[in-house]
Amino acid sequence: MSATLALTEQLIARASVTPDDQHCQQIMTERLTALGFECETIASHGVTNLWAVKRGTDGRDGKLLAFAGHTDVVPTGPLEQWSSPPFIPAHRDGKLYGRGAADMKTSLAAFVVASEEFVAAHPGHRGTIAFLITSDEEGPATDGTVKVVELLEARGERMDYCIVGEPTSTTELGDVVKNGRRGSMSGELVVKGVQGHIAYPHLAKNPIHLLAPALAELAAEQWDEGNEYFPPTTWQVSNLHAGTGASNVIPGHADLLFNFRFSTASTVEGLQARVHAILDKHGLEYTLKWSVSGLPFLTPRGELSGALENAIRTETGITTELSTTGGTSDGRFIARICPQVIEFGPPNGSIHKIDEHIEVRFVDPLKNVYRRVLEQLIA
């Protein structure tokens, strides 16, 4: 069994359902400390975070390449639906099964072993290797990576490159990497009306009827055209509720939850202003509460993307696709202190599902790609 596969199984065997790390980071710390890393545990409200650094011969003047990832996993779902226990690694038909196999314990193991091989081959490496690991990525993500980034900002610590080990591939290892993510902003809209008997509409004010024209306009709006890296911004309703449940009562208010997934072609302030303008144009009496869970970030083609593309092509023969599709990730926090952030990991077809798995044939090539990137950028 390869070193990467063995470490992956060791991590899967820890039932680290968010935010419980279950000593996964301790396993990693023991390996990294033996390599000469300085490891710091940063705890916050039940969340375990790890910041580990190994300086190269250039010291703080050298380039810093960080690997960011998470040890927490999503809940298993109904255990009886699993073909084998989710926290007992199992091999079937060339696949390794277990919760976290794809998201993202294989990536964690791969970068640890890649670092071990890199340091052994390049003991005098010039640049710095770092790990930023959290147990709060699958949960609220309020005490994990964002807290470590805030601490690093306060210390004046910088990163030059960061690989986030998210499972970005689709069918083959390396067919897709993420060089950015859209921003996410939600709104809670309450449109006020006047409750009354449905037989006497002149004595009431129906908020559903008032909202409908504005809702149609919001749904039809072209928010932007996207750009080279991002598709156009989207606006979607996730929840719409009004009424008491009775068939003879005009409701007193209508509640609408909606979400923007927005590109770098739009801003938070600009989108909010346009929504308010549409609501105001229709004369609505309303309250609107905004929440921004992440800003868009983008890493244009450059050193990190080039090194990763070269490594993937050398290892797999695949020409990778740079993409910004999908949901948010911890990359949105890291982009605040790192100009080049790219996500790359194994295929994601089984993540968060019953019988999550990874094809064993991808495990060591993933490690090799990570090692090749280290060799290109900080050797």
Swiss-Prot record:
Pathway: Amino-acid biosynthesis; L-lysine biosynthesis via DAP pathway; LL-2,6-diaminopimelate from (S)-tetrahydrodipicolinate (succinylase route): step 3/3. Zn(2+) 2 binds at D103, E138, H352. Zn(2+) 1 binds at H70, D103, E166. Its EC number is 3.5.1.18. The active site is at D72, E137 (proton acceptor). Its cofactor is Zn(2+); Co(2+). It comes from the Bacteria. One of its GO terms (molecular function) is acetylornithine deacetylase activity. This is Succinyl-diaminopimelate desuccinylase. Binds 2 Zn(2+) or Co(2+) ions per subunit. Keywords: Amino-acid biosynthesis, Cobalt, Diaminopimelate biosynthesis, Hydrolase, Lysine biosynthesis, Metal-binding, Zinc. CDD domains: M20_DapE_proteobac. Homodimer. Pfam families: M20_dimer (PF07687), Peptidase_M20 (PF01546). PROSITE patterns: ARGE_DAPE_CPG2_1. The keyword Amino-acid biosynthesis applies. NCBIfam families: dapE_proteo, PRK13009.1.
